[in-house]
Amino acid sequence: MTFSKTRNKIIFLLFLIIINIFNINAYIKDENEDDLSLLISTLDGNIYSFNYESGELNWDLKPNGGDSLYSTSQFDRKQQQSTSTSTEITKSSPSILIPTLDGSGLLFQYSNDRLHQVPFSLQELVNTSPLFLKELEDKSSTSSTSTTSESSKDENKVTMFIGNKKTSITVVDSQTGEIIKSMSKDGLWLTDEDDCPVNIIPDEALMFTRSDYQIIALDPKSGVEKWNLSVGEYIPHSTKSFYNSEISLNFEGLIEVASLSQRMYKIYIKKPEKTVVGISHNYWEHILTSSPVSIYAYSSKKHILKKLDFHRKVSPYSNSLIPVASTDLMIPSNFDRTFMFDDYYGQLFIVSPPSNNNNNNNNNNNNNNNNNNNNNNNNNNNNNNNNNNKNNNNNNKNESDKSNLTPLTPYDPSKPNGANNNNNNNNDLLDSNKLKNYDIYLYSSIVILITSIIVFIRSKKNFNLINVNNNNNQNNNQNSNQNNNINNKKTPKKKKKKQKNKNNKNNNDEDDENEIENYNDNQNDLIDEFISTNSVIQQQQQQQQQLINSSNKINNGSGKIILDNGNVKIGKLEIITNKILGTGSCGTIVYEGKMEGRKVAVKRMLSQFVKFADREVSILIHSDEHTNVVRYYAKEEDDEFIYLAISFCQKSLDMYVQQTLSLQISPTDSPSIQSSNNNGNGNNGNNNNNNQIIIDNKTKQMILELFKGLEHLHSLNIVHRDIKPHNVLIDPNNRVKISDMGLGKLLDNDDQSLTFTSDSHGWQPAEYLNGTNRNTKKVDIFSLGCVVYYLLTGAHPFGHRYNREKNVLKGKFDIDQIKHLPDIHQLVHSMIQFEPEKRPDIGECINHPFFWEVHKKLSFLVAASDYLEFEKPTSPLNLEIDSHVDLVTDGSGDWWLKIDQVLIDNIGRYRKYNGKSIRDLLRVIRNKFNHYRDLSPEEQTCLGILPDGFFNYFDLKFPQLFIVTYLFILKNLKNDQYFVQYYY
């Protein structure tokens, strides 16, 4: 009876708890049903309002025509000066000014591969206009000012800055997005009403103020404009004074913006689980046509109007929009870049300056009361603040930044709930006090529920145990004695040292205790073994160090000291003679060594080749600051040899490839040469071989690093002339480095070719071998193309060792092993052309689509389809691209034969497509991409997820389609404004 009553009470308690939890969920759901929305302003001047819970678009508008928030003439001027790639454009002189678009107004000057922060913000330049500044020096980040009456010797370098600020106002209905009233930048209201806007707008209205800061750089002598730059920002305001909420907000969700292409940005909103109780989906996403600049949370019911932080995800190749040279080449391979760049139709801007990378969001949250109160003051009195002097601006700059802006912090996907690297969250959209009560109530209920279940199970177990071991109508004393008898039974695993607590535990407790004791004993044994092993290792290290320190040094009279351990000490270098890293021509040997405690590679060369060593040292000094060129540390010499201390590398590229071939490492470890028994291309028809080369990201990165290293040498007018697998090294961080520039030569400014013969044959082009003295930078392009093919296949494109030179002179090569990889096949094919003028330069190699991300390739195909759509079907362009239909369809001549039936049933439903037209195939890709969300689940499953799965579907069906389209646009429309972003 006792157990029955207890069980009934527990069941009743569980019933109450379950009802209570449902009430909590309903309460939270009711609280979440509000008008919370996200206000997003984009770089093209648009404003969007999304419902925070559902992700539905409430409205979008273009105030004042939707002019872009950023424009500059700097990059147009540079494109006129150079027709090279975008990387080369930014390198050319003079320097350029790059703004940040986070509202801080910070400006950075890019000059000679360096970024310097300008000591004046954009607002300060406008407020102090006119301003006379000297151009920044190459190695300095400071600028000096002068008045109009000053004159100096560097008068030609002085630039006059004229600035102005224009403000416009747009009053919007926050529910519908309808523009109620607006004021232009000239101060004119664009409605017929004469009332003050505060008197005519409803309570639910929002007022967007747009401030545009423009600076114009002029030549003070001639008055000619050098360039101009304009940056604007939208700031929303509410007409309700109580929107300055004093509640500290803690947004634990994630707002992430991913750059898909120049015209496509995906905004991803992930909401925290506790704010969406009972809802299966806690995230949503949208594609925007321009980069988001600011995001605000707005709710009229909760009186929220707060600027939110969001994380940006930029492709690694997007960071190469502007090269920033490293000042320390010994950095780890997984370092994070300080700056994140993006561009708007070729105009660079910074989305994440270093000042925002380490900010702590807790400061923003903890000081929210004061900051919120200061927000409207700063915004409403912006014009008054602009009239302050320069000193006041400098003193108040940090405070205003903190009050108006939440910092952009890099997103770490390894941390839960989108927390940033500082373990801090963004601003919350819920009342933290209410949320705290929800948590306490919910968590306490769960704890009670779990505790009740445990009590119920243990009570039932004890009750059954008593029934088995007692007769009916036994009294409490008998029950107690019986329980003691059961507990006094010993188990085989019971240990004696727990005897004193034996009577207070049942058999199950004893088993658990034994397992814990056995586990602890095993852990103690492992710890003892580790301590013992560690002591032995430390003892061996101490003995080795004592042996080195106490060794008797023998001086052989030539500046060389032989240590007792057999190592050779010469100058600052210690050479480990029994560790040979490699050998070279002319008696060259590379040893492992040490220099001032740093592990280095020591290259020993015969003194008679000192001329080559001096040339190599000179080139290494010039290329000292690049991660993909071997770094020079020191040079020592004795009577016989010259010793060069260079970056320590574990192996050469030749050793790497040979080890991969001999070991046949698994696909996860072997990045370049692998077998594939399943080509996974369906009816593709192009990859039918069982053994095919597979290229993963590691191999692609190695090839890119090779190109980057050569790009650095060529930027210094250095021609290597001896690029081969033996002269490409791999360091402990798996970075590729170009070495052995002993045969290189530094070209003079007016000298574009050189005449010098090398003993390394088989990797040089025909013009080098036949002695025509046309050895320009294209020599290195040819050699690098051969090295890339060797990295991928382990073979040489011009055949076996003894036939290579003959085949090179004939222009006879075979690269069919990578024919199933059209991108890299076309790149290598162009690099090893017989005629030097047909080979690309190193900038074109780096910008080749082989290195493009999937989303960029997909964007390119869509752009090509957009352009060809406006051409007549019989136009020369459409006729030319359609002539490649046999190549694209692998000889079938009709792309309909390769499309899956589920797509065929849908494609022909709306319009007719010609299976013999490449233009129509591109149209299919464009339409399916633009209407992907409208496709049926079967079609989405067939095509795969955007963008990777979608692109791979068509790439596997038509592996030649992309490269054919790329070469077609390259030939006919390369300089068209529609495609210039892809080629420069």
Swiss-Prot record:
Active site, per annotation: D722 (proton acceptor)
Q: Topological domains (Cytoplasmic): residue ranges?
A: 458-984
Locate the compositionally biased regions of type Acidic residues: 509-518
Q: Name one GO cellular component term.
A: IRE1-TRAF2-ASK1 complex
| Molecular function GO labels | ATP binding; protein serine kinase activity; protein serine/threonine kinase activity; RNA endonuclease activity; unfolded protein binding
Q: Which residues form the signal peptide?
A: 1-26
Q: Which UniProt keywords apply?
A: ATP-binding, Coiled coil, Glycoprotein, Kinase, Membrane, Nucleotide-binding, Serine/threonine-protein kinase, Signal, Transferase, Transmembrane, Transmembrane helix
Q: Where is there biased composition of kind Low complexity?
A: 82-91, 141-150, 356-397, 472-489, 677-691
Task: List all topological domains (Extracellular).
Answer: 27-436
Report the locations given in the UniProt record: Membrane
Residues annotated as glycosylated are: N228, N398
**InterPro entries, per the entry:** IRE1/2-like (IPR045133), KEN_dom (IPR010513), KEN_sf (IPR038357), Kinase-like_dom_sf (IPR011009), PQQ_b-propeller_rpt (IPR018391), Prot_kinase_dom (IPR000719), Quinoprotein_ADH-like_sf (IPR011047), Ser/Thr_kinase_AS (IPR008271)
User: Main subcellular localization, coarse class?
Assistant: membrane
> In what residue span(s) does the Protein kinase domain sit?
575-851
Membrane topology of the entry: Single-pass type I membrane protein
Which CDD domains does the entry link to? Luminal_IRE1_like, RNase_Ire1
Q: Which residues form a coiled coil?
A: 467-533
- From start to end residue, where is composition biased (Basic residues)? 490-503
Q: Where is this region: Disordered?
A: 70-91, 137-157, 352-427, 472-518, 667-692
Quote the catalytic activity from the record: L-seryl-[protein] + ATP = O-phospho-L-seryl-[protein] + ADP + H(+); L-threonyl-[protein] + ATP = O-phospho-L-threonyl-[protein] + ADP + H(+)
The record lists the membrane-crossing segments as 437-457
**Pfam families, per the entry:** Pkinase, Ribonuc_2-5A
- What protein am I looking at? Probable serine/threonine-protein kinase ireA
Q: Give the organism, scientific name.
A: Dictyostelium discoideum
GN (gene name)? ireA
